[in-house]
């Protein structure tokens, strides 16, 4: 899980979702998981 000021899709499987007021990226590639901090 990367915590970033700016979350971006890193590949075509990444999806940007909003969960509990936080922007997150979920993906089939575990290294692509991100949340906005």
From Swiss-Prot:
Keywords from the UniProt entry: Ribonucleoprotein, Ribosomal protein
PROSITE patterns recorded: RIBOSOMAL_L36 (PS00828)
Gene Ontology MF terms in the entry: structural constituent of ribosome
Any one GO CC term of the record: ribonucleoprotein complex
One example of a Gene Ontology biological process annotation: translation
SUPFAM superfamilies in UniProt: Ribosomal protein L36
Official protein name in the record: Large ribosomal subunit protein bL36
């Amino acid at each position: 899980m990367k915590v970033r000021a700016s979350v971006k899709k890193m590949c075509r499987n990444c999806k940007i979702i909003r969960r509990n007021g936080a922007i997150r990226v979920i993906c089939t590639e575990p290294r692509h998981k991100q949340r906005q901090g």
